[in-house]
Design a protein with these regions (language model features):
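Extreme N-terminal starter segment of soluble prokaryotic enzymes
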Residues: 15-17
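Charged catalytic carboxylate motif
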Residues: 28, 123-124, 150
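Hydrophobic pocket/interface hotspot
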Residues: 29, 33
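Active-site acidic-Proline motif in GNAT/NAT acetyltransferases
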Residues: 112-114, 118, 146-147
């Protein structure tokens, strides 16, 4: 649940703090979101669409999400490195009609491209799944752009597997073909225990 002043765990080996997002984080989170989309989807989505992505519009969207009451939105976590937000992850109830309440969803995970490859995505991913597990989830799903091989390889390295479901989403007139991944959390061993208190 975002907006609460709760102490989340740090992983000393990474020097990274994973904590609950707060409304004042919205502008930086929006920049991370837009920058990650532009880098990740370059060559995969029309450049003219990527050029129209607005940090200002995303700031309003994230500020609203971070201000919602518990239970109305997914849990939003930010990753801080040396006091600077470099990532955002959202995890919560599953939005698909063919899943049960024991299956949660990783709604999104975005990392500043300047920090790709340093292991921080792994830490943020771990924190998000710790929250899902602490909430009672037995499994989790996520949707990824089918042609985004970098993201698919990241999730596959973390134990996710495509479950056979595909869908087409639209952003205006831009088509996004997506593939669903699933991960069992039955044997999940939480690594950021303080996050369990915010689920």
């Amino acid at each position: 649940m975002s907006g609460e002043s709760l102490e989340c765990a740090t992983l000393p080996d990474m020097g990274l703090l994973v904590r609950c997002a707060e409304p004042q984080d919205a502008p930086v989170v929006a920049r991370v979101h837009v920058d990650s989309w532009r880098r990740a989807y370059s060559g995969l989505l029309p450049q003219e669409y990527l050029d129209t992505l607005s940090v200002e519009a995303r700031t309003k969207t994230w500020a609203k999400a971070f201000s919602q009451l518990p239970g109305q939105t997914p849990t939003n976590l930010v990753a801080e490195l040396d006091g600077q937000i470099i990532g955002i992850a959202s995890v919560g109830p599953n939005r698909d009609n063919d899943t049960d309440t024991a299956t949660h969803e990783l709604w999104g995970l975005y990392l500043d491209p300047a920090h790709w490859g340093a292991g921080h995505g792994h830490t943020l991913h771990t924190g998000a799944l710790d929250v899902a597990h602490a909430s009672g989830a037995a499994a989790a799903t996520l949707w990824v752009l089918t042609t985004n091989q970098r993201a698919r390889h990241f999730y596959e390295r973390h134990g996710w597997a495509a479950d056979g479901a595909d869908k087409t989403a639209w952003r205006g007139d831009v088509r996004l073909d997506e593939t669903r991944y699933r991960l069992s959390l039955r044997a999940w061993a939480p690594r950021t225990s303080a996050l369990a208190d915010i689920a």
